[in-house]
């Protein structure tokens, strides 16, 4: 599976950080809403929902979900 530095090489993606049951994705300006749209349309049970601005996405995660599961899922949304 793809790690964060691999995803960073993809167009639009800059970083991913976790705090409790929240994840924050930073993107280049203008990319956040399209990435959030792709995340939301996968109906992934461990991500309750997203809120996107111009260059930031907040993901609300299911309680106690393993960060590795989220990173793995995101590697399919944000491929190399």
Please give the residue ranges for each predicted region.
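Short, charged, intrinsically disordered terminal tails
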Residues: 70-80
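Non-DNA-binding regulatory cores of transcription-related proteins
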Residues: 2-71
């Amino acid at each position: 599976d793809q790690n964060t530095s691999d995803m960073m090489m993809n167009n639009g993606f800059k970083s991913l950080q976790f705090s409790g049951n929240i994840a924050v994705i930073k993107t280049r300006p203008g990319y956040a809403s399209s990435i959030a749209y792709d995340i939301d349309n996968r109906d992934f049970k461990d991500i309750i929902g997203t809120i996107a601005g111009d260059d930031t996405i907040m993901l609300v995660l299911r309680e106690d979900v393993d960060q590795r599961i989220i990173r793995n899922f995101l590697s399919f949304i944000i491929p190399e």
